[in-house]
């Protein structure tokens, strides 16, 4: 983002310099005035055109001045933003705890993967045990809490797991004739 502002400021400065050079070149060229044109200078209509030209030159010079002021203000603004951003970034880094959040996220992903593997292994074994040790599972799941303190989310997960286990136990224990 800094480089975009830098390139924009550089472009404005180059454009301003090229406009100034082209205007200086046109002003420095000598104008040849023929005899017929000197006769026109006595004409009042020609005086109005000269007046308009001088007004246009003044407004052109004034607009060049305003453009240069805008470019200077823009560069000052860019420098201030850069200075302020460095101070804000330093303060922000002091309070950021990205590494801790990443660790808890990785651990919870690992634990979820392990639980899925255990469930699949249990299904493949042919439903060896018909009941779950629910008391041990509840204590174990309550012991695994995230660092961010999302207690209600964990309770919902535990309750969903208990409901799923009850449903699986019901499916296993009921006879096929009772299910119809």
UniProtKB/Swiss-Prot annotation:
The feature of type site (Cleavage) is located at 52-53, 83-84, 91-92, 97-98, 130-131, 145-146
Q: Which GO terms describe its biological process?
A: adenylate cyclase-activating G protein-coupled receptor signaling pathway; cellular response to glucagon stimulus; gluconeogenesis; glucose homeostasis; negative regulation of execution phase of apoptosis; positive regulation of calcium ion import; positive regulation of ERK1 and ERK2 cascade; positive regulation of gluconeogenesis
Residues annotated with Phosphoserine modification:
54, 105, 108, 150, 152
Q: Which residues cross the membrane?
A: none
Post-translational note:
Proglucagon is post-translationally processed in a tissue-specific manner in pancreatic A cells and intestinal L cells. In pancreatic A cells, the major bioactive hormone is glucagon cleaved by PCSK2/PC2. In the intestinal L cells PCSK1/PC1 liberates GLP-1, GLP-2, glicentin and oxyntomodulin. GLP-1 is further N-terminally truncated by post-translational processing in the intestinal L cells resulting in GLP-1(7-37) GLP-1-(7-36)amide. The C-terminal amidation is neither important for the metabolism of GLP-1 nor for its effects on the endocrine pancreas.
Residues annotated as carrying Arginine amide in the record are 127
What the entry lists under InterPro entries is as follows: Glucagon, Glucagon_GIP_secretin_VIP
This protein's UniProt keywords = Amidation, Cleavage on pair of basic residues, Hormone, Phosphoprotein, Secreted, Signal
Which Gene Ontology molecular-function terms are recorded?
glucagon receptor binding; hormone activity; identical protein binding
Task: Tell me where the signal peptide lies.
Answer: 1-20
Localisation per UniProt entry: Secreted
UniProt cross-references to Gene3D superfamilies, sorted A to Z: 6.10.250.590
A Pfam family matched by this chain, by name? Hormone_2
Any one cellular-component term (Gene Ontology): cytoplasm
Propeptide at which positions?
84-89, 131-145
Q: Spell out the residue ranges making up region: Disordered.
A: 23-58
Induction annotation: Glucagon release is stimulated by hypoglycemia and inhibited by hyperglycemia, insulin, and somatostatin. GLP-1 and GLP-2 are induced in response to nutrient ingestion.
The family annotation for this protein states:
Belongs to the glucagon family.
Spell out the protein name for this chain. Pro-glucagon
The uppermost taxa in this organism's lineage are: Eukaryota, Metazoa, Chordata, Craniata, Vertebrata
């Amino acid at each position: 983002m800094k480089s975009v502002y830098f390139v924009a400021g550089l472009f404005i400065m180059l454009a301003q310099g090229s406009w100034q050079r082209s205007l200086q070149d046109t002003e420095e060229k000598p104008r040849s005035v023929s005899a017929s044109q000197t006769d026109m200078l006595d004409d009042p209509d020609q005086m109005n055109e000269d007046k308009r030209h001088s007004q246009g030159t003044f407004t052109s010079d004034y607009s060049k001045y305003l453009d240069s002021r805008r470019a200077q203000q823009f560069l000052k603004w860019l420098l201030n933003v850069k200075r302020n951003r460095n101070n804000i970034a330093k303060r922000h880094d002091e309070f950021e705890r990205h590494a801790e959040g990443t660790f808890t996220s990785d651990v919870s992903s690992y634990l979820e993967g392990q639980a899925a593997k255990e469930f699949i292994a249990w299904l493949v074994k042919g439903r060896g045990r018909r009941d779950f040790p629910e008391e041990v599972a509840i204590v174990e799941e309550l012991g695994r809490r995230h660092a961010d303190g999302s207690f209600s989310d964990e309770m919902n997960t535990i309750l969903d797991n208990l409901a799923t286990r009850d449903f699986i136990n019901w499916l296993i224990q009921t006879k096929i004739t009772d299910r119809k």
